[in-house]
Amino acid sequence: MNATRAEYPLASLYIGDLHPDVTEAMLYEKFSPAGPIMSIRVCRDIATRRSLGYAYINFQQPADAERALDTMNFEVIKGRPIRIMWSQRDPGLRKSGVGNVFIKNLDDSIDNKALYDTFSAFGDILSCKVVCDEYGSRGYGFVHFETQEAANRAIQTMNGMLLNDRKVFVGHFKSRRERELEYGAKVMEFTNVYIKNFGEDMDDKRLKEIFSAFGNTLSVKVMMDNSGRSRGFGFVNYGNHEEAQKAVTEMNGKEVNGRMVYVGRAQKRIERQGELKRKFEQIKQERINRYQGVNLYVKNLDDGIDDDRLRKEFSPYGTITSTKVMTEGGHSKGFGFVCFSSPEEATKAVTEMNGRIVSTKPLYVALAQRKEERKAILTNQYMQRLATMRAMPGPLLGSFQQPANYFLPTMPQPSNRAFYSPNPVAPVRPAPQWASHQSRPPQYQPPAPLMRAVPPRRMHSNISTMKQASTQVPRVPLQSQRVANIGTQTAGARAQVNASIMRAMPHYKYSCGVRNVQPIGSSAHLQQVLEPAVLMQGQEPLTASLLAAAPLQEQKQILGERIYPLIHEMHPTLAGKITGMLLEIDNSELLHMLESPESLHSKVEEAVAVLQAHQAKESAPKSAPQSLI
């Protein structure tokens, strides 16, 4: 094994066939007796974090890795024998096929260890595996030798030998492409013919009489069920290809026993499955191409909208070939599909109908996507959101961050210090106070934005000293300092709120040389200490990346807190209802409305018109109809 050790100087081992519950700690406990370990990594799915069933272990010394490979291979961890081999970073060595041997017709009792023990006599083995499924061994496996000479010796010695009373085939490994090329050449010279759809009144003798007219038949077989009746298909094997081809040409489509029979080349199951799969994919692709760019997905439908109403709403934009509202138990599921005759008509419908309010609900209209495409897009969005959250700076003083409803005095800072928010989104947000079915009480005000403490500009003392000092500062709850209408204050009013809070606070200063903080007497100095530490989180600019960093269940809530005050300025009595209606629109369009007052005003007026029409419809029977506004 010296040559092997020189070839893999990093002493890295691949551990395969692991149980999904095996962790790095279990592997360390198992392999640490072999020698000092530098690192262990169980490979996991990037999205679900589930184990992929293999791991890598890096030893400090190649001799320790070699010892683990020799003594621990095929040992059982959590009921499964593990498989150990040298880690090969170069995929060319694995895919070249040099030294790789294929064995088939194995007995079910032969596992990885038995195969390894049998073939290790011919040379050093890089990897050894018996292919299994949920039912056990599939009867074949692979042995990858370190050299081609060892592989040749194994083939010469073991091919045709009995292994557990079964004659095994041992040969050079061939890639799937090589096998398909060889099989394709043999297919053109077929001699075996498949016949189906001749009914139950057929046996071997009669089938032979029919097909012996085309040549010498070596074998004829009608497939039977357990009761001895024909299953309606069978096989005829001819002596040469010309006779078989003549039988196919003459008999395919002819009537036998009053039935039109199919006669063709006999195929292996895997070949037939592959052909059916190709046909299915072809039909699927044709369907995708036919509906590409013309099929629309419509969601947020009112429960009263059916297929006819959906067609009526979209018919002004072009010729509709089909409409369908998806239902379950006779009730609408809230979404459906509209298919146009051309992509131009579909694009126009998306432009005009997306966001339009139909029966008190704004529609979401977009090009329909296949499940695979939608899943890929959602996965990509999730990964981008995850990367954005990881890229954002973490809390500088996170080890002793105060509760959200407490104010923490901080160290003196220059007045021009930029605001630093430890977390881009508030950790706790109150539940939404609006609903689409009822207006908000006139006296309601949006929740007060949380106040954050700004970390110091320089930190010369160690963290433990700062933590001890911070625990000595009394916490003054903001509950006693609440100010009415804090969500709609002007900049001057916010400054007065800050000043009133600071006047109520005890005076402290921070000293890195002592454990206890001391009060100071200068109120002017207090103003310099505390003013940069308070900022309304609700005034932070809301961007797409900041919104994406928030949990999905909080994103609508964040948008609602931003959009409600703007709607309240236009229609105070209907702000709650309008906010609830607009929040059903896509987040990207809501962000656009926050940036564009004209777009927001247009949507608000459209919602008001719908509400007025709805009330007028309800109050029509009354003698004195009343307006909403």
Curated annotation (Swiss-Prot):
Gene3D superfamilies referenced in this protein's UniProt entry, alphabetically: 3.30.70.330, c-terminal domain of poly(a) binding protein (1.10.1900.10)
GO CC term (a single one): cytoplasmic stress granule
Transport among keywords: no
One GO BP annotation of this record: negative regulation of nuclear-transcribed mRNA poly(A) tail shortening
The PABC domain, residue ranges: 539-616
GO MF entry, a single one: eukaryotic initiation factor 4G binding
PROSITE patterns according to UniProt: PABC, RRM
Keyword entries, A-Z: Cytoplasm, mRNA processing, Protein biosynthesis, Repeat, RNA-binding
InterPro entries named in the record: Nucleotide-bd_a/b_plait_sf (IPR012677), PABP-dom (IPR036053), PABP_1234 (IPR006515), PABP_HYD_C (IPR002004), PABP_RRM1 (IPR034364), RBD_domain_sf (IPR035979), RRM2_I_PABPs (IPR045305), RRM_dom (IPR000504)
Subcellular location(s) per record: Cytoplasm
Domain (RRM) ranges: 11-89, 99-175, 191-268, 294-370
One Pfam family from the record: MLLE
Subunit structure: Interacts with dazl in an RNA-independent manner. The C-terminus can self-associate and also interact with the C-terminus of pabpc1, independently of RNA. RRM 1 and RRM 2 interact with both eif4g1 and paip1, and the C-terminus also interacts with paip1. Prior to oocyte maturation, found in a complex with dazl and pum2 proteins and spdy1 mRNA; pum2 dissociates from the complex during maturation. Interacts with the translation termination factor sup35/erf3.
Function: Binds and protects the poly(A) tail of mRNA with or without an AU-rich element (ARE) and prevents mRNA deadenylation. Stimulates the translation of mRNAs to which it is bound during early development.
Family according to the record: Belongs to the polyadenylate-binding protein type-1 family.
Protein name: Embryonic polyadenylate-binding protein B
